[in-house]
């Protein structure tokens, strides 16, 4: 930054053939009066530790760096080589974005200082005075950093400073400092709001994952119950077929017994055979009665399985509704976060462009903080269907 003596230019150089284990180059263009502590403070904003080796400032740290003089002689360029890891790529990109935003803010301050120089030049053009004095002030204003590097001046006597110009410069410095303080406060508030939204979003994501796990368990249980129901139905069909076969045998035995009674009423052998047939028929009847009991029991079990299956389906539908509701909440929070981010960017641009936003920023920030999240209406639960045995 050439507009003021307390700033620097940060450039992140990425070669086209950069690999995962290559070295990142961070170039800092400093004024000659910039100290090592100020350089370290600027480097810490980017998430890295930078040690500047300036003349007259000793440092005990060892870091690959290169000190280069600029072409015009007003600046010193320190190239600091930072070893980056492939796993920290996203963090590096985030730090680069922060550096770009800070450079943008510095550029805006530089534009303000350039505008102040133009205003002072226009005032000097309008006000009559000593042409040599105006020429000296014009030479000072046209310098890239706004001050002379050489200790010698144009005249042997110390120059007189215009009080109005000094007051304008002081007021501009105070305004820039106030703007930076308010901007940092807005960024801190935005960071806290973003952290709160991220915590809420992570909580909803955990709830959604838990709901998905519970839903998967319910689906597995329903599949198991369905397999058991199919097995019971298969057994039930087999018992019904056996029941029909036994009924046919009973009818045949009764018919044979009746024929024997008609044909051989007086024959003992026939009586014994008839008694044996009667015993067999009695045994068949007991088996039929037992099969009827088993059939009714299996039917009750099937009805209970069907009822449990329907209840499980109702639970699954309610879980699906809960998951959908959580997804809608997540989408709503993401939309609110994006909207708040856009509003903050618009507010920052508006505040920097106009320079008068103390009350408006506070009111808009309070309005942004009061975000209401409306819960979407939950779907009605499915009715519970119970099978009644008749």
From Swiss-Prot:
It is found in: Secreted. One of its GO terms (cellular component) is cytoplasm. One of its GO terms (biological process) is biomineral tissue development. It comes from the Eukaryota. Ameloblasts, and also non-odontogenic tissues including kidney, lung, liver and testis. Keywords: Biomineralization, Coiled coil, Secreted. The keyword Cytoplasm does not apply. GO terms for molecular function: structural constituent of skin epidermis. Residues 356-383 are annotated as: Disordered. InterPro entries: Tuftelin_GRINL1A/MYZAP/CCD68. Residues 88-126, 163-352 form a coiled coil. The keyword tRNA processing does not apply. Involved in the structural organization of the epidermis. Involved in the mineralization and structural organization of enamel. Interacts with TFIP11. May form oligomers. Belongs to the tuftelin family. This is Tuftelin.
